Amino acid sequence: MPQNQSDIRRVFLHTGDAYLGVKPTIVSTVLGSCVAISMFSPRKRQGIICHAFLPSRAEIKDVNEPSIQICRYVDTAVDHLLKSMRRLGVRKNELEVKLFGGATGLSYSQVRPSCALGIGNRNVDAALENLEAKGLKPVSMDVGGNVGRKLLFCTYSGDVWIKRLEKHMF
């Protein structure tokens, strides 16, 4: 636990990125149709979070396009988060998982038009399906709707603060 506010690092999480906090960090991000998945170990007091853009790698226009952002896609992000926590010695059954985002809205130029329909809901569904396939269930969720969210994730407590953005801001 940090002694004071100056001991806490602050990081902004971009789309497709993940952040593993082995030291006290406040991770912020802004979500529209994207989803953020956090995993926290109360025993280790360490957490990880990702900002995923699409349900699966198959959603992009050019599936042969190389992507170094493994967390850009929900399906690969869940695997990455679990592997990262496992490397820290965290067992799957001790994880607190949380899920956020999945609002309506997306720039259609970024994906095939048939994939863009309901992308927020599809991101949430993909997250829930991938987590369930790994035997995980979120302890907390704030998903869907038609407004974006600003999110703050505290890596040493697992706490998450959400601010819903006004429609005219999104």
Curated annotation (Swiss-Prot):
Molecular function terms from GO: protein-glutamine glutaminase activity
Highest taxon above the source species: Bacteria
Membrane spanning residue stretches: none
Alphabetized SUPFAM superfamilies for the sequence: CNF1/YfiH-like putative cysteine hydrolases (SSF64438)
Reaction equation(s) it catalyzes: L-glutaminyl-[protein] + H2O = L-glutamyl-[protein] + NH4(+)
Keywords: Chemotaxis, Hydrolase
GO BP, sorted A to Z: chemotaxis
Family designation: Belongs to the CheD family.
Name of the protein in question: Probable chemoreceptor glutamine deamidase CheD
Species name: Maridesulfovibrio salexigens (strain ATCC 14822 / DSM 2638 / NCIMB 8403 / VKM B-1763)
Name of the gene this protein is made from: cheD
